[in-house]
Design a protein with these regions (language model features):
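Nuclease-adjacent, charged terminal/linker segments that flank catalytic cores
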Residues: 1-102
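Non-catalytic C-terminal interaction segments of nucleic acid-processing enzymes
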Residues: 9, 15-18, 29, 180, ...
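Short glycine/proline-enriched coil/turn segments at helix->beta-strand junctions
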Residues: 37, 167-170, 196-200
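Amphipathic coiled-coil/heptad-repeat helices and related helical stalk/stem segments
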Residues: 43, 114, 159, 186-189
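Active-site metal-binding core of divalent-cation-utilizing nuclease and nuclease-like domains
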Residues: 69-70, 107, 123, 128-172, ...
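Amphipathic alpha-helical dimerization/coiled-coil segments
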Residues: 88-135
Length: 258
């Protein structure tokens, strides 16, 4: 529950920032500004306050890392992510024992792409009307669903959504595809959503039209090959990044619905 950490009465400002980075995985200054509503100066102060827990540059990175982003691929300067000590500190704050690893630098585009979906929605919808679950929280929700149904979880169909978005009374599973996953992994995720037997729409966001069309075709072929006997399948909506916002916020949409 990302937004509950903002101005949390039990945590200091820099601790709130640590909890927010823990939930987001990785984020740049612009994303942090939008999510928190804090000034850029406050964001910088909070980051430096966290890093000050370490004495050497290496120890500072154990608390929060600054990951440079190539200017040719992004106008952003750096992305921030918690290091090993930062993750452990937040888990103690939250009284969580679950395993969490550092966000891999190789997935920086993926994390920022997921966060951008939220940022675009926040530009249209008040924060108090939003619920945003991280991948870990969305996965935990699925686990609780399996347990509530008293069904044995089939590992073949177990999925880890990128996020779950709630806007007032509407809910969506969110998947950001950065054109890195192969057909086999995507098909496995498609099967996972079918076997959820859940009516929540799945929104796929791709970096370009070519990738969006590929995902759409792959989903069509999966349905035709495995679920053509009138078996219920979830709504799958496919968008180029940025085009999903009107659909999610119920404005005029350019969705490709299958």
């Amino acid at each position: 529950m990302l937004f509950k950490w903002i101005d949390h009465p039990s945590f200091r400002k820099h601790e709130q920032m640590m909890a927010i980075l823990y939930e987001m995985g990785m984020a740049d200054k612009r994303q942090l500004q939008t999510v928190t509503g804090w000034s850029l100066r406050t964001i910088r102060w909070a980051i430096e306050k966290i890093r000050a827990k370490g004495a050497t540059p290496e120890e500072k990175d154990e608390w929060v890392r600054s990951i440079p982003l190539p200017k040719r691929t992004s106008p952003r300067e750096v992305a921030y992510a918690l290091g090993r000590m930062g993750i452990r500190y937040v888990q103690d704050m939250m009284e969580e024992q679950q395993h969490a690893r550092e966000a891999p630098e190789a997935q920086v585009k993926h994390f920022l792409g997921i966060n951008d979906i939220l940022i675009r929605v926040m530009e249209k919808v008040p924060r108090e009307d939003l619920v945003w679950l991280s991948s870990a929280e969305a996965t935990d929700l699925l686990l609780r669903t399996w347990e509530r149904r008293r069904e044995e979880r089939d590992k073949r169909y177990f999925i880890r959504p990128d996020a779950r978005l709630g806007i007032r009374d509407r809910r969506y599973w969110i998947e950001y595809d950065n054109d890195t996953e192969g057909a086999r992994k995507l098909e496995r995720k498609f099967h996972g959503y079918v076997h959820l037997n859940d009516s929540t729409p799945v929104v796929w966001v791709a970096p370009n039209e070519k990738r969006r069309d590929y995902l759409q075709t792959l989903w069509k072929n999966t349905v035709k090959a495995f679920y053509s006997n009138n078996q219920s399948v979830p709504e799958m909506h496919f968008f180029v990044a940025g085009k999903e916002t009107p659909f999610l916020t119920k404005e005029e949409t350019e969705a490709v619905l299958v």
